[in-house]
Amino acid sequence: MNPNQKIITIGSVSLTIATICFLMQIAILVTTVTLHFKQYECDSPANNQVMPCEPIIIERNITEIVYLTNTTIEKEICPKLVEYRNWSKPQCKITGFAPFSKDNSIRLSAGGDIWVTREPYVSCDPGKCYQFALGQGTTLDNKHSNDTIHDRTPHRTLLMNELGVPFHLGTRQVCIAWSSSSCHDGKAWLHVCVTGYDKNATASFIYDGRLVDSIGSWSQNILRTQESECVCINGTCTVVMTDGSASGRADTKILFIEEGKIVHTSPLSGSAQHVEECSCYPRYPGVRCICRDNWKGSNRPVVDINVKDYSIDSSYVCSGLVGDTPRKNDRSSSSYCRNPNNEKGTHGVKGWAFDDGNDVWMGRTISEDSRSGYETFKVIGGWSTPNSKLQINRQVIVDSNDRSGYSGIFSVEGKSCINRCFYVELIRGREQETRVWWTSNSIVVFCGTSGTYGTGSWPDGADINLMPI
């Protein structure tokens, strides 16, 4: 090969390499531009149209780093849409309950600014659990805490914090309320907030931080709601509300709410005689509630809600080991599934239970007459067999010589099943502890477990002699 041929060959090879490099740079440029614009668009599987990502509610942003010939390209993948919760998974099989959370609010109030509260509850969005309570518009170490034993004042507000975070001064006040319920439909929070005069109260429905709807008192006698979480299935949330006598016939309605708007109202039907302060849980495809009969029964009413056709049925828990306080002793108490037992039916306390096949798990105060101690157990046949009394898997949550209070249920969706959890209100102060002028609470929370567990007692634990008066 002569010199001219060598020059031509080298030139041809160089030109070929340069052309390849040029084409590669064009490809990189096209890829970069394409990815840059595609991060703001998602393919719609329904009609193959392009939809903007920005207005869509998302669960998370995912960023992938792609390396091409020393060029770094950031590609944002469009996140999946957030869907309504449907709670269609089965209920978890459990052997009992394990400790989950305790906020120690009263003990912390001895040396810090903590809200005075009562009527606490717990509810979870798809990723995190929150604790709620009705604040009294004051901290404990504050003269405004005097006489906070009263339930209904215009200063009461619904407080919301992450579970385990006491209600400190930075706590969000969600709404004005002396009775409330909250739940998350998979996209946003719904808060039902009742406030106003006893004879003409208003319930406000706040969805995604906005007031969407309201309803006024229909019986002019203390409109009130659950004091625990409501339940949403496929975008329809249900809440049980009562207006009328606390010791006689009252008017209970079940409201169906979609994104904060009341879409239907159903009257209570079935054999339940008096229904208040329901503890509700998803029982796909419907909702089931265990409530308080403050008139005739120490056995707890059951309210079954059909979300699809808005129909309602009601009855009573079959277990002869009844769940309300006050009640007869276990040898004398009874329940026959359909009607109130007419045993120490006046007064009562908010509580919970849930079905497990033919059996029932339940919690109650250990004392038959006062809000002292707390226990849980399973009653074999307690859901289906009248007056069943075979108790197993009993656990003490709070010893009998320590104070308890309201309790309620909340549900947590896992990978394969829905777990049931409960909270116990630990009331301190007046009326029983007259050294101080305030009434407030802390909480303890347990969740169902399929594992083993030990024993203990988890009272409030504050020394009343160390507390502000």
From Swiss-Prot:
Gene Ontology process terms (BP): carbohydrate metabolic process; viral budding from plasma membrane
Membrane protein topology class: Single-pass type II membrane protein
Top-tier EC class: hydrolase
Residues carrying a glycan: N61, N70, N86, N146, N200, N234
Cofactor section: Ca(2+)
Keywords annotated in UniProt: Calcium, Disulfide bond, Glycoprotein, Glycosidase, Host cell membrane, Host membrane, Hydrolase, Membrane, Metal-binding, Signal-anchor, Transmembrane, Transmembrane helix, Virion
Miscellaneous information on this protein: The influenza A genome consist of 8 RNA segments. Genetic variation of hemagglutinin and/or neuraminidase genes results in the emergence of new influenza strains. The mechanism of variation can be the result of point mutations or the result of genetic reassortment between segments of two different strains.
Protein's name according to its UniProt entry: Neuraminidase
UniProt source species: Influenza A virus (strain A/Swine/Hong Kong/4/1976 H3N2)
